[in-house]
Amino acid sequence: MKVELYNHIVRNGLTRRTMLKGAASTAALAAMGGAVPALADGHSALRAAIMKIPGVGMGSPGDAEWQKVGEMCLGPVKDRVKPGEFKGVELTFMGLNNQNLHNFLFRGFLKPWEAYTGAKINWIDLAQADYNPRLQQSIATKTVDFDIIEMGAPFEGDTAGQGLLNEMPDWVKDQIDYDDLVGYLQPPVGTWDGKAYRINIDGDCHTFCYRTDYFGSGSITGRANPPKTWQEVNQISKDVDGKKDPLTGLPAHGFLDPLKGWGGFGMYFLTDRAGPYVKHPDDPAFLFDIDTMKPRINNPGWVQAIQDVMDLIKIDGAYPADQINADPGTTGFQQFLAGTGSMLTWWGDIGSNARTNDSSVIGDVVGFSMIPGSDKVYNSKKGAWENTYNEAPNNAYLGWGVYVTNRVEGDSKKRKAAWSAAAHIGGKDISLWTSAYPSGFQPYRNSHFVYDEWEAAGYDRAFIEDYLGSNLDTYNHPNSLNEPRIPGIFQYYSVAEDELAKGFAGQYSSAQETADAIAAAWEKITDSIGRESQIKLYKASMGL
């Protein structure tokens, strides 16, 4: 969650949030085209109680709080499972250990579940950079050694498409209130061939994080407001070179591009830059041509994004020293939170740590907005640039979900136990808590946007409207980037990272040559998987 991240967010222009200031009705949100929040139901007392654990301003929660919330939210489990019903069942759960969250939270939430049901859970904890290789190994060998997995929707083509997942029972849909999702996470996301597999636990999007003390009267940028376009971002990065950071007194830096790969996940950060250049409002595609799967990664829009990064690499001091070895974990947690640099894009984790992480020094000088746009966009259909402002925020990774694998098939007791555990950590009430406190997960249910629940818990009304609205701005943007759930998507991303690293290190002569190398590698991946099947799945993933 990102509640502690800031007291105020600087945003320019008329947005959904500024129009909603002081609005009390959910109808106001609906009129703006956003998701209509589901009103609090019979669990309102429980929801109010868990929202006060540990309470506003009482510090970052830990295992004791996670276990308490898990215990308080056991009601739906007890309605469907008898005490000790799963005694003797052992389950293996594979997930992340990022920033001591993810699996750490799940352990806490599930300890009361284990005590009640009698089941035992064994854990496979993975760092972000190790996640894709570990999963791809299981996919390639079809040797799945886990019963439950924390996984993003982009991998559904690799897993559900190959029969590695177990279909969600109807009773689970009832327990988790399956339909309570913001629009972009509704099916077909989480489904394959009409069958449901995913319990949503997150709603991913990248937002723009910036240092408010770099802007305003007397600031080192000389600009009143943060940038609205990537062209401005690069210019600011050049302008602050050689100046002193107003907070630390160390060298000032502009945008923090991660120049080192991150197990395929680093591709999302180049996509942040490229999106407004390449995602034309009249074209649903941005990675491949729809009818041929021909890569677009080497078209003028993508090349411009790569060139923007290379332009900053050429300027000694534009980036911190040794940026070539900085992955997104470095840029977010070792640089930006520690006071190095003034701008970056990231998931909500940065916000949730800005005021709760002991290593953060920027809590009072951090602001957030939607990812910058561009003053031009490349029209792939016409093969020409159009000099018009364009926005294309990035719903990067489509959020984390929890899935049950085919290892449980043939054992009804184990299958029920696995789905019960998954449903518990993806439940409606527990998800409100993960949205409201540091967890690594962003709001994703319509019911998360009931402002009164947050205000009753002690959060400032204006802040909550601003914070939740910043997610809706991206989720509901008509030109947002929603990646295709096709087999091999992270093979494409990983090889792109490899070639980008070569380009950023000067091993290729230009941005175009770098992009051409990625495109050639992507063509080989498509042919190895099967072009015709990829075209079919690519179209299906875009609803065509």
What does each of the following model-derived ranges do?
Residues 1-18, 25-32:
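N-terminal secretory signal peptides
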Residues 46-50, 61, 75-80, 90, ...:
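Long, aromatic- and glycine/proline-rich binding clefts that accommodate carbohydrate-like moieties
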Residues 189, 218-221, 315, 359-443:
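Extracytoplasmic/periplasmic substrate-recognition and gating elements
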Residues 52-85, 152-207, 236, 269, ...:
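Hinge/lid segment of periplasmic solute-binding proteins
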